[in-house]
Each structure stands twice: as C-alpha cells, then as structure tokens.
Amino acid sequence: MSQQGFDWGLSATHRLQQWPPALEGLLPGWRETVEDFLASDAGQALSARLTQALAQGAVVYPPEPFRALTLTALDEVRVVILGQDPYHGPGQAEGLAFSVAPGVKPPPSLRNIFKELQRSLGLLIPVDGSLVRWARQGVLLLNTSLTVEDGQAGSHASLGWQALTDEIVCEVSRKSKACVSLLWGAHAQAKAQAIVQTAARHGHAAHVLCANHPSPLSALRAPTPFMGCGHFGRAQAWLQAQGLDWCWPELDAPAR
C-alpha cells in the first residue's frame, strides 16, 4: 500500500500508543539494558514526559521505539549506524534509523545513503527503503533520540534519550571484539569518545567513522561531507581485516 493511499498519521498502528511499550520482543542482551534505564531517574523522567505528551494528544513516532533491539542481537552487532532522531513525517519512522517500510517513498536522507552505497560498493539502489535485512545481519540502526513528535524534527532531543543510547553503544563496545561505528551528524559524533574508550578498556577493537548527516541540508557540506565519505566500503574492509567474513547484505534491488 502506498504512503499516499493510507492515512498513516491517524492510524493507531503507526504511531506510539502507550508508554512504556512491551519489552518482550527485545533480543538477548538488550532487555536488561532497557529495563535498567527505565528504572533509573533519567528513565523515569523521560517516561513521565512521554506519558504526559501522549495524554495531551501528541502524535509521537515511531510505534516501536525499541524495534532495533528486537532485530539485532547484542552479540551479533558488527556495525552501528547512528543517526539523530526518527523521521517526523506520517508513516515514515519504523523504529530503525533511516529505514522505512516497503511501499513508503524513501526520504531524502535514505536516498543519499543508497547513492553512497552504490558509489562505494557498486550495489544497486534498492526498490524500497526497508533496512530490515541489514538489521538482521548485524547492523544496529540506532538514533540518538528514539522518539519524535509529528512534524517537529529534533523535538525529543532534550527528552533524555541520550542516557539510554549512550549505554547501548557502550554495551556494544563492551561485548563486541570488533565493531565499526558510523556516526552521521553532530548528535551521533558526540558519542565517539565513549565508544572508543569503552572498547579500549575491554581490549576490543573499535573503528569509528564520522561524516555529516545524510540529509540534503548537510550531505555535501564541508569539512566531512556524507556524499563521497566511503563509509560502506571502509567499514567492510576493516571488518574483513579483523578476520570477520562480513559484507553488506544486499537489499531488495531490481533485476539486472
């Protein structure tokens, strides 16, 4: 079903309905992290603000803020892609950074990601914007903030999500012996030092690559433009140099 033919913004299944959401689907390694956060002072403050916003009628995306943690197990993470916050348009955000469901037109940031993927590795541009296949093959698709209000980019940047997303990326550094982190934009790059230092304390290899956010507003901007950054090829080459037989899973693409 096309995005134009369905009122995603009003659909009860494509917006956050309650807080906290069910945690049963979280994969091993993640549930304790999320539960500890929700029980903390920071987590309780975030919960209170989200609950109040929903009670006042705010439209909040995505419907499953923790979806990335239901598709990529902690011990299987090979790459972390870290963005800023979910898409803020109706029917776009689905709980995986930059991903949209099949049938939804890829937003400009995702189109730039596909262009860079093609330029870097020669892979065909996919027919839709779903990155679920990546998530199931060790790519943790995470934003620094896990919720956003309809039509208001960055609206939940100060809600308190960073305490949890900091812990998530540090947990990856603690558990993964070799992981690449692709940090796109200033919000993501603020976590670089914590990622590297945590990995070093545990004797693990961490490779951090930084570039501007793939949004058209910044993708070509100096000094670290996203377009031409080569992150996909560089990440794959580094992992293979660590002895890992890993390459970017090819997404659904048109027949050659």
Features from the language model and the residues they span:
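A short acidic (Asp/Glu
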Residues: K191-I195
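Sequence termini and other peripheral, non-core segments
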Residues: M1-L16, P20, A253
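Generic N-terminal amphipathic, Lys/Arg-enriched alpha-helix
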Residues: T13-V34
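A polyanion-binding, active-site-adjacent surface
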Residues: F6, P28-A190, R201-H202, H207-N212, ...
